[in-house]
């Protein structure tokens, strides 16, 4: 069984005499920076000129510097800007400001695993990947808890990379819930697979197909929306809280029986093969190459698809219904 590291296993003092630069002040950036500061770590924020986040970071009491300055002055530099921006930022502002023994950190392995960022041999390269969005990382921290995380060491120049990355994980509150060791390869490939096959791509297509099946059969659009999309949160929350057994305990016996006899009629071997194909494209770099190319060419297909999805019938029905749900406001 994989080992989990908790508060008692990690020494936060490792970071107390270091300066940490958090590059980016978005979802994860604000959470990492504030949690580290609350734990007594010296934190500065590195942002590009004209960043919309600069004012917010200053209002939150942080010293804001350019990415280059923050990198140069820090002992640990955490890259928290979006994946598609990291290569450019690294090449222009980080690469030439790294010094021997510095720690270069990431919250996702994409750019290291797919060789978009190629650090020099004289730095440690690590990852701390919280298993939750930034607002949750911050919110549960303020309540005395934490979001679990994965950690990895890609390059250990100082022979102290593991204690450094674990201290960082403790600094953001992750060891309160537990952190699990992985590799950049495993984190990247499993994270992308989960997003594409289940959490985002898979669930979106399942919902849309269920909705369309009911509407095509003559049922009201609003009823189809409630049954196939709105109630999804109720079920997912139960699974999140206590696994499939909690969900099945909480639903009716009729629903549970339908789960057993019909689930496999929908998610067939064809779906399994589709998942395998998705995983292979992640493993062999085909997906990464396509995403990198999409960004290099201006995101035309990406933005077109986003617009098309916004204008689908189910999206319009959802917006109308949610506008009448006062409890969502």
Curated annotation (Swiss-Prot):
Active site (catalytic residues): 108
Binding site for Mg(2+) 1: 191, 195
Catalytic activity, EC: 1.1.1.86
Keyword Amino-acid biosynthesis: yes
Residues reported to bind substrate: 252
Protein's pathway: Amino-acid biosynthesis; L-isoleucine biosynthesis; L-isoleucine from 2-oxobutanoate: step 2/4; Amino-acid biosynthesis; L-valine biosynthesis; L-valine from pyruvate: step 2/4
Alphabetized UniProt keyword annotations: Amino-acid biosynthesis, Branched-chain amino acid biosynthesis, Magnesium, Metal-binding, NADP, Oxidoreductase
Gene Ontology CC, one term: cytosol
UniProt-annotated binding residues for NADP(+): 25-28, 51, 53, 83-86, 134
Classification via Pfam families: KARI_C (PF01450), KARI_N (PF07991)
GO biological process terms held by the UniProt record: isoleucine biosynthetic process; L-valine biosynthetic process
Any GO molecular function: ketol-acid reductoisomerase activity
Source domain of life: Bacteria
Family annotation (Gene3D superfamilies): 6.10.240.10, NAD(P)-binding Rossmann-like Domain
UniProt enzyme class: oxidoreductase
Residues in KARI C-terminal knotted domain copies: 183-328
Role, per record: Involved in the biosynthesis of branched-chain amino acids (BCAA). Catalyzes an alkyl-migration followed by a ketol-acid reduction of (S)-2-acetolactate (S2AL) to yield (R)-2,3-dihydroxy-isovalerate. In the isomerase reaction, S2AL is rearranged via a Mg-dependent methyl migration to produce 3-hydroxy-3-methyl-2-ketobutyrate (HMKB). In the reductase reaction, this 2-ketoacid undergoes a metal-dependent reduction by NADPH to yield (R)-2,3-dihydroxy-isovalerate.
Record's protein name: Ketol-acid reductoisomerase (NADP(+))
Protein species of origin: Clostridioides difficile (strain 630) (Peptoclostridium difficile)
Lineage: Bacteria, Bacillati, Bacillota, Clostridia, Peptostreptococcales
């Amino acid at each position: 069984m994989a080992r989990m590291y908790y508060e008692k296993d990690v020494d936060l003092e490792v970071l107390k005499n270091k300066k940490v630069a958090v590059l980016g002040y978005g979802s994860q950036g604000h959470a990492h920076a504030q949690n580290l500061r609350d734990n007594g770590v010296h934190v500065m924020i590195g942002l590009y000129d004209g960043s919309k986040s600069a004012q917010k970071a200053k209002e939150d009491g942080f010293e804001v510097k350019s990415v280059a300055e923050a990198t140069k002055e820090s002992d640990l530099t955490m890259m928290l800007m979006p994946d598609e921006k990291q290569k450019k930022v690294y090449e222009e502002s980080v690469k030439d400001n790294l010094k021997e023994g510095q720690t270069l950190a990431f919250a996702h392995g994409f750019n290291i695993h797919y060789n978009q960022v190629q650090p020099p041999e004289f730095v440690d390269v690590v990852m701390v990947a919280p298993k939750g969005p930034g607002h949750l990382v911050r919110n549960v921290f303020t309540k005395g808890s934490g979001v679990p995380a994965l950690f990895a060491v890609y390059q250990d120049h100082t022979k102290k990379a593991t204690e450094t990355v674990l201290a960082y994980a403790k600094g953001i509150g992750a060891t309160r819930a537990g952190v699990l060791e992985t590799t950049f390869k495993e984190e990247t490939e499993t994270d992308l697979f989960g997003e594409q096959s289940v959490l985002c791509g898979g669930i979106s297509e399942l919902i849309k197909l269920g909705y369309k099946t009911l509407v095509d059969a003559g049922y009201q659009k609003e009823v189809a929306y409630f049954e196939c999309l709105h109630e999804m949160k109720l079920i997912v929350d139960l699974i999140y809280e206590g696994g499939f057994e909690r969900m099945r305990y909480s639903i009716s016996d009729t629903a549970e029986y339908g789960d057993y006899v019909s689930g496999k009629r929908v998610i067939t071997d064809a779906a399994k093969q589709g998942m395998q194909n998705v995983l292979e494209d992640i493993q062999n770099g085909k997906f990464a190459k396509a995403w990198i190319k999409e960004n290099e060419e201006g995101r035309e297909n990406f933005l077109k698809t986003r617009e098309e999805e916004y204008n689908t019938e189910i999206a319009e029905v959802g917006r109308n219904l949610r506008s009448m749900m006062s409890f969502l406001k």
